Curated annotation (Swiss-Prot):
Pathway: Pyrimidine metabolism; dUMP biosynthesis; dUMP from dCTP (dUTP route): step 1/2
Subunit structure and binding partners: Homotrimer.
GO MF annotation list: dCTP deaminase activity; nucleotide binding
Taxonomic source organism: Korarchaeum cryptofilum (strain OPF8)
One Pfam short name: DCD
InterPro entries linked to this entry: dCTP_deaminase, dUTPase-like_sf, dUTPase_trimeric
The protein's name in its UniProt record: dCTP deaminase
Length: 177
């Protein structure tokens, strides 16, 4: 069941769902808007074949911090954005993230991202700027909408994977065959 603003506020008030910082205007009718955090990761294009099962991900990305002037994203570029907010999920709630329609209408796209029950950390989301012209982004822009769903009871194994507790933009892990 998709949780309403009232149900989300109740989970937060009870300390079962933690979102920090939480801005009052972030809680929407059926979800929470999140803001662009302090860092961004750009791909490093070398023209060589990447092997995500063998390569060190840090060789293929460069991480930068936002300044007051923002950061210019080149046209047709994939980036990793991190949320300003740190989230701690209950063991009986999962979430689905998508871009806010206002940012999508400018030309950004992102694959829907699942947040597992029991996850905690800042969210790192891959976003694609689809226009040929560069665009300037700023820290603090509301870019992500997160909707919450109750699971049928608490999950037996809450999330405890490689991204648990992540802070800052987090690069992908190596893929397993």
């Amino acid at each position: 069941m998709l949780l309403s603003d009232k149900a989300i506020r109740s989970l937060i008030r009870e300390g079962k769902l933690i979102i920090d910082p939480l801005y009052e205007d972030s809680i929407r009718e059926n979800g929470v808007d999140m803001r662009i955090g302090p860092e961004i990761a750009f791909p490093i294009v070398r023209g060589e074949v990447m092997d995500p099962t063998k390569d060190d991900p840090s060789l293929h990305f460069t991480v930068r911090r936002f300044s007051d002037e923002g950061i210019i994203i080149p046209g047709n570029t994939s980036i990793l954005l991190v949320t300003e907010e740190y989230i701690k999920m209950p063991d009986d709630v999962a979430a689905l993230c998508g871009l806010r329609s206002s940012i999508a209408r400018w030309g950004f796209i992102a694959a829907p991202t699942l947040v597992d029950a029991g996850f905690e950390g800042q969210l790192t989301i891959e976003v694609m700027w689809t226009r040929p012209a560069p665009v300037r982004l700023y820290r603090g822009i509301r870019f992500l909408h997160v909707v919450f769903f109750r699971t049928e009871g608490k999950v037996e194994r809450p999330y405890s994977g490689a991204y648990q507790g992540q802070r800052g933009v987090t690069l992908p892990k190596r893929l397993e065959k």
